[in-house]
């Protein structure tokens, strides 16, 4: 799958993991109904699939995508100028260019804090009862405050 295939699900205001799962595993309902897999296991596996496709932890990926969505008017043209093409690149490669673009546009004094926030392990990893998407987004104010 190219980056576009992933981003059409993950770059929405609320990432559409349910539809992504059904696209990747079309027989999922049958597997859950037959008891071959539990629904909570499906989401855990899907987060790992996102991690593999992105070559970084899923929470870092979702936060990067969130920053791109909020700041698309700034980052979109920069990504194009850097040759980032989500139609031909993997999700991992596209996210690499996105991260370099974000860091390049940021005040160097603020990169450490940005990276700490980006890579912070979410509570849902520590406490599986929490909703994974509640704490994944980095709001516009947080991003802009890091830019200088």
Identify what each model region corresponds to:
Residues 2-19, 23-148:
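Charged interaction scaffolds used for protein-protein
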């Amino acid at each position: 799958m190219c980056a576009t295939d992933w981003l059409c699900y993950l770059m929405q205001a609320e990432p559409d993991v349910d539809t992504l799962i059904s696209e990747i595993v079309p027989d999922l309902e049958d597997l859950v109904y037959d008891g071959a897999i539990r629904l909570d296991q499906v989401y855990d596996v899907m987060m790992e699939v996102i991690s593999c496709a992105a070559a970084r932890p899923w929470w870092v990926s979702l936060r990067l995508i969130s920053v791109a969505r909020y700041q698309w008017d700034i980052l979109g043209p920069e990504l194009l100028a850097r040759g980032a093409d989500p139609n031909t690149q993997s999700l991992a490669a596209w996210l690499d260019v996105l991260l370099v673009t974000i860091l390049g546009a940021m005040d160097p004094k603020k990169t450490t804090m940005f990276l700490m926030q980006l890579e912070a392990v979410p509570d849902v990893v520590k406490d599986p009862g929490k909703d994974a998407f509640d704490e994944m987004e980095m709001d516009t104010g947080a991003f802009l405050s890091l830019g200088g």
